[in-house]
């Protein structure tokens, strides 16, 4: 880069930054290697999560008069992703569970209240990064004093119980809130995790200072990614690749899509079965 030239912004998503934090080697395989190593089989819990997200997004696109619990269940059935399950019978059991989840969840929503966005892409820029990402749902609400406020809603279908700390510490949710506030010129500090299996909502109200800290954290992570990307693109010997993109072996390696291409990950944890991430799994 020539002296005096503006620094190129690093384009990223919260998912990309999180991938770097989790494991630099997996980050390289996901975003830089071309072609990437072959992935393992699809995960049933990801199929279930995508099916639920798609059904809820479709529900909001229905005419208001048709936004009912059974309609959400029908959308779930129509868009069911039957991948990663041990058998058709197991898939059917979880499809029925998922149908009940979306019917129960949508029964508690006001169909007349239009979200500001559904599966909405938001983005923002700083002096260092150009960040973008997609929000499950962006609500427009009124505070007690009548002030217009926005809230970021993220659907969760995993078996792990959640707390407000999960909402508080989530870097993606904080970045989505900051980006949405800037895009819509409104206050957006509230982030919510809607855990459909338990029917619970776990929320956090950020301060401006808290959002600024999360943005600074994202910029620092992005700087590490950008430096590693440049070194990779310039060409690295095999030893250099591992030095810049080291593995982080641990129990999570059993869930990694690239476990078969990673000796350290393969040694760190046994491969999980594609349906092991489902609640109460038994084929």
What residue spans do the PLM features occupy?
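Short beta-strand or tight-loop elements
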Residues: 13, 114-120, 131-136, 249
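A non-catalytic, helix-rich entry segment at domain boundaries
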Residues: 54-119, 125
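Mg2+/Mn2+-dependent nuclease catalytic core
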Residues: 120-220
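Active-site-adjacent bridging/hinge elements
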Residues: 24-32, 147-154, 226-227
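Glycine- and acidic
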Residues: 36-39, 155-162, 283
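Hydrophobic (often cysteine-bearing) scaffold residues that line and stabilize catalytic clefts
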Residues: 44, 48, 94, 169-172, ...
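Nuclease catalytic cores
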Residues: 17-37, 41-62, 95, 99, ...
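Metal-dependent nuclease catalytic regions and adjoining charged, substrate-binding loops involved
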Residues: 11, 179-283
């Amino acid at each position: 880069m020539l002296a005096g030239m503006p620094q190129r912004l690093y384009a990223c998503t919260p998912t990309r930054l999180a991938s770097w934090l989790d494991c630099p080697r997996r980050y390289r395989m996901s975003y830089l290697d071309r072609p990437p190593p072959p992935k393992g089989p699809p995960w049933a819990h990801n199929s279930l999560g995508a099916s639920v997200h798609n059904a809820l997004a479709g529900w909001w696109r229905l005419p208001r008069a048709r936004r009912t619990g059974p309609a959400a269940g029908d959308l779930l059935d129509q868009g069911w992703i039957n991948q990663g399950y041990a058998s058709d019978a197991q898939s059917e059991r979880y499809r029925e569970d998922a149908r009940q989840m979306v019917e129960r969840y949508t029964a508690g929503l006001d169909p007349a209240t239009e979200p500001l966005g559904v599966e909405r892409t938001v983005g923002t820029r700083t002096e260092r990064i150009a960040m973008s990402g997609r929000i499950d749902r962006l609500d427009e609400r009124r505070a007690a004093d009548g002030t217009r406020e926005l809230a970021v809603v993220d659907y969760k279908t995993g078996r792990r119980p959640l707390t407000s700390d999960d909402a508080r510490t989530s870097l993606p949710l904080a970045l989505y809130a900051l980006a949405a506030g800037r895009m819509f010129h409104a206050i957006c500090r509230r982030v919510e995790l809607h855990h459909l299996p338990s029917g619970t909502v776990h929320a956090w109200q950020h301060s401006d200072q808290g959002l600024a800290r999360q943005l600074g954290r994202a910029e620092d992570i992005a700087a590490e990614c950008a430096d590693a990307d440049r070194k990779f693109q310039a060409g690295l010997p095999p030893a250099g690749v591992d030095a810049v993109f080291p593995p982080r072996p641990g129990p999570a390696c059993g869930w990694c899509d690239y476990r078969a291409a990673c000796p350290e990950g393969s040694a760190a944890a046994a491969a999980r079965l594609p349906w092991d991430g489902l609640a109460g799994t038994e084929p």
